[in-house]
Amino acid sequence: MVKDFSAEEIIQYISDAKKSTPLKVYVNGVLGQVTFPDSFKVFGSENSKVIFCEASDWEDFYNDNKNYIEEVEIEMDRRNSAIPLKDLRNTNARIEPGAFIREHAVIEDGAVVMMGATINIGAVVGEGTMIDMNATLGGRATTGKNVHVGAGAVLAGVIEPPSASPVVIEDNVLIGANAVILEGVRVGEGAIVAAGAIVTQDVPAGAVVAGTPAKVIKQTSEVEDSKREIVSALRKLND
């Protein structure tokens, strides 16, 4: 389902999705005669199991078999979740531990998503783009190629309240740490957004903007090359 979602389509998708509360359950006991439901994924030995199941299914199972269960430990990291995390097995990018990337986000080749970054449903991370630590791409936010989104920066989503126009970051843009790009804003190719800026209007290609609200302060041609370099070595994957 890789497509350009509208906000309304995402809202409908979330509304219609079967909500899930998955559990990981560690069980010790006399389990050799216990019959596990087909909906369970069960691993382990006769007297010690690891079970993956839905919370509602576990309650019924436990009540029926608690006389056989001696010890139990339950891990739960979500409740009534509508959107699972993205399956990254076929993603040709560098994804670091602790990044949260939701299903139906697009991560293009050679991208980098750092620890703590959040990529919401419908967002697009372009080829060779780096999403730095704790940055957020809200629903439908889109980056082009070779963009750097600095640590803690926010590209606002357009799911709630629904907005027709997502944030669009064109190719070769640098966004400083803790900058905020508001809904509907387009940042033109090669522009630079200073750290901490709040961008409320479109940014022309090649402009440098700073402040709250952000305003053009100069052109990127006036910035040293070393301060706007995209380092290809950081995007290198295994040969």
Swiss-Prot record:
Reaction catalysed by this enzyme: (S)-2,3,4,5-tetrahydrodipicolinate + acetyl-CoA + H2O = L-2-acetamido-6-oxoheptanedioate + CoA
Coiled coil: none
Pathway note: Amino-acid biosynthesis; L-lysine biosynthesis via DAP pathway; LL-2,6-diaminopimelate from (S)-tetrahydrodipicolinate (acetylase route): step 1/3
Top-level taxon of origin: Bacteria
EC category name: transferase
Keywords, alphabetical: Acyltransferase, Amino-acid biosynthesis, Diaminopimelate biosynthesis, Lysine biosynthesis, Repeat, Transferase
Cited HAMAP family: DapH
Name of the molecule in the record: 2,3,4,5-tetrahydropyridine-2,6-dicarboxylate N-acetyltransferase
Record organism: Staphylococcus carnosus (strain TM300)
Gene symbol of the encoding locus: dapH
